[in-house]
Amino acid sequence: MAELTRIEGVLRTEFGKGASRRLRRDGRIPLVVYGNELDPVHVHVDTLDLHALVRNEGVNAVFELNIDGEDNLVMVKAIDQNVLTLDIDHADLLNVKRGERVEVEVPVIHEGLPAPGAMVVQDVDVLLLEVDVLDIPEEIVLDINGLEIGEQILAKDVKMPSNAVLVSDAEELVINIVEPEEEELPEDDEAAAEGEDAAAGEEAEAPAESED
């Protein structure tokens, strides 16, 4: 596999909301590293480094976090984003080992177009998989090209990435191909349309005036 991204982390010496705000103001993101029977480790990293990692490698990114000269294999477990700016305010990392299998939620997307007159409804956005920590797929892509009304894709129908095992319910509905619903006019619009139809009918029934 490709070489892992390496990010420098610095142990935190101050804690609390005020300290976290100061870190973010200085271009740093506070993190907590959990896992492997170790006590949680509080660190902070460069904002640009973490944003680039998540943007390029996804929300389940695995990378080397260097703390005090020692590399630690970690994966992103949870991200707290600012609801307005979408900037990462905080992240939880999981300390992992090479060869370890983990359960992760992998994003699901679809590509292609269903048959003419059909509409695609995607019922779930992620599937829970068990995979090797170094083989986590960034996403699962489903081909819906040409699917007809009434066809469905269940979780058990999804082709799993190499060495991945489905953990989600096998019968979970992922994709549903349906007939588009007719858009209902608001009552005011319906009344106006009926009035126009009635007026048109009256005009058609009115006798033509004689020309003298």
UniProtKB/Swiss-Prot annotation:
Disulfide bonds: none
GO cellular component: cytosolic large ribosomal subunit
Any Pfam family hit: Ribosomal_L25p
Tagged with keyword NAD: no
Biological process annotations from GO: translation
Keywords, in A-Z order: Ribonucleoprotein, Ribosomal protein, RNA-binding, rRNA-binding
UniProt region (Disordered), positions on chain: 179-212
One annotated GO molecular function: 5S rRNA binding
Top-level division of the source organism's lineage: Bacteria
UniProt record similarity statement: Belongs to the bacterial ribosomal protein bL25 family. CTC subfamily.
Subunit structure: Part of the 50S ribosomal subunit; part of the 5S rRNA/L5/L18/L25 subcomplex. Contacts the 5S rRNA. Binds to the 5S rRNA independently of L5 and L18.
HAMAP family: Ribosomal_bL25_CTC
Function: This is one of the proteins that binds to the 5S RNA in the ribosome where it forms part of the central protuberance.
Protein name: Large ribosomal subunit protein bL25
Organism from which the protein derives: Corynebacterium urealyticum (strain ATCC 43042 / DSM 7109)
Gene giving rise to this polypeptide: rplY
